[in-house]
Amino acid sequence: MKNLEALLKSSFAIEFEDKTLLETAFTHTSYANEHRLLNISHNERLEFLGDAVLQLIISEYLFKKYPHKAEGELSKQRSMIVREESLASFSRHCAFEPYIKLGKGEEKSGGRNRDTILGDLFEAFLGALLLDKGVEEVRRFLNQVMIPQVEKGNFEKVNDYKTSLQEILQAKGDTIIDYKVINESGPAHAKQFEVVVLANQVELSKGIGRSKKLAEQNAAENALKALSEE
């Protein structure tokens, strides 16, 4: 953790008071499960908290930045910014990946470079920072790391297949779109989800991914491809 602390101090002027919070943020469930006798905490609860504060700060930023955009447009842009792949890229930008504590199985399966884990790590770090320093410090960090990328328009062309599918189908009439997990496989540290996308209870396509969100995006992408071939 000493090297991580040095990184945070030199790159972001962040010094944690509660070092345990920082360590927990970088501890994956697979590591905690392999060391159960030590009663080690993992980062899922911090991820939950970080997700909430991230949504709040990005929502406020977009609301003030684009006073004439409708709610739907703001929601779409926010979803692009806070999606799994985007958050994983921010973890990489911050050089967080070498410091994640992973179980042996997760490490061997390439977990250190997996978007799901890196995205969750970024949210967990925000949760830890919130508890240790407060919301304004989280805002300062995001203004340094995320907002410059948003200002450059790097999230305006991200493929949001779920939104695209919804827009196409609803343009044809009233359509209720639903996503359902139909299968889960793999160990806890390397889950794989299969999702089916339905339109008015009629199956359109399926998708597979390392997270439910990614599987849903893949299902929507496959549905769009099928519709384009009709």
Swiss-Prot record:
GO CC terms, sorted: cytoplasm
Per the UniProt entry, the disulfide pairs are none
Q: Name one GO biological process term.
A: rRNA processing
* Active site residues per record: 51, 123
Q: Which cofactor does it need?
A: Mg(2+)
Task: Spell out the reaction equation it catalyses.
Answer: Endonucleolytic cleavage to 5'-phosphomonoester
Q: Transmembrane residues, as ranges?
A: none
Q: Which InterPro entries match?
A: dsRBD_dom (IPR014720), RNase_III (IPR011907), RNase_III_dom (IPR000999), RNase_III_sf (IPR036389)
Out of the domains of life, which is the source?
A: Bacteria
**Ranges for domain DRBM:** 160-229
Q: Which residues bind Mg(2+)?
A: 47, 120, 123
> Which Gene Ontology molecular-function terms are recorded?
double-stranded RNA binding; metal ion binding; ribonuclease III activity; rRNA binding
Location in the cell reads:
Cytoplasm
The segment(s) forming the RNase III domain are 5-134
Q: Could you tell me which NCBIfam families the record lists for this protein?
A: RNaseIII
Query: Its function?
Result: Digests double-stranded RNA. Involved in the processing of primary rRNA transcript to yield the immediate precursors to the large and small rRNAs (23S and 16S). Processes some mRNAs, and tRNAs when they are encoded in the rRNA operon. Processes pre-crRNA and tracrRNA of type II CRISPR loci if present in the organism.
Q: Which PANTHER family match?
A: RIBONUCLEASE 3 (PTHR11207:SF0), RIBONUCLEASE III (PTHR11207)
Task: Summarize the subunit comment.
Answer: Homodimer.
Similarity-based family: Belongs to the ribonuclease III family.
Q: What is this protein called?
A: Ribonuclease 3
What species does this protein belong to?
Streptococcus uberis (strain ATCC BAA-854 / 0140J)
Cite the source lineage: Bacteria, Bacillati, Bacillota, Bacilli, Lactobacillales
Write the gene name.
rnc
